[in-house]
Amino acid sequence: MTTELKVMVGIPGSGKSTWVKQEVARIEEEHRTTCVVSRDFVRQSILTDRDSYFDKEVEVFDEFVRQINEAMELGIDVVFADATHISPASRAKLLGRLIADPHTKLTFEVIDVPVETALERNAQRTGVARIPDSAIKKMKKGFSIPTEKEFPKTNWGFSNIEVRVYH
C-alpha cells in the first residue's frame, strides 16, 4: 500500500486539528496506520517558557519536516502535516523539503471558515496556543486554496495531487 500525505491548509482556529482527529479515527477503523505531525506540538516541544511563539522558527520547521519524512519513510499509510500552509510559498517551502516517493499521494485538506469563526475558537484557547486576533485576520487575507497553477511540473515528486475543500 502507498503512503498518502495529507497537508492541512487553513488559518488558526479553522478546525484543522479537530478535523485531523476525526479523520484519524475513521482511517484507523479501516486498520490503516496514521501519523499526525503537528507543527504546534513540535513548537511546544522546542520552546521554553522564556520564548515567544515564533522564536526558534527555523528549528521548529526543520523538526516538523524531519518528522514527516521519517513517517513517510517508515511506510505509514496516512501521514498528516498539521499546520496552516495558507500560501503557495508556505506549501512549496514544505513540499520542497520532503522526500517524496513517486508512489506517495499528496492531498491538500483545506478547511476554509469565516474569520469570525476562527476568532471565536481562538478566544477559547489559552497560553501559547492563543494567537493574536490581528495575526489571524492577517493570515485570512493571505489565505489561498491550492490550485494546479502553483504545482511545479514535477509535482514535488508525488504521483498524484488532490485538493479537497471543506467549509
Descriptions of predicted regions:
Residues 1-3, 72-73:
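Phosphate-binding P-loop
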Residues 4, 33-35, 78, 105-107:
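Residue-level recognition of the N-termini of beta-strands and the immediately preceding loop/turn
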Residues 16, 44-47, 88, 118:
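Conserved protein kinase catalytic core
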Residues 41-43, 85-86, 112-117:
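Conserved nucleotide-binding/hydrolysis micro-motifs of P-loop NTPases
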Residues 50, 54-61, 84, 129, ...:
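Flexible, glycine- and charge-enriched loops at secondary-structure boundaries
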Residues 55-106:
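Glycine-rich phosphate-binding loop used to anchor ATP phosphates in small-molecule kinases
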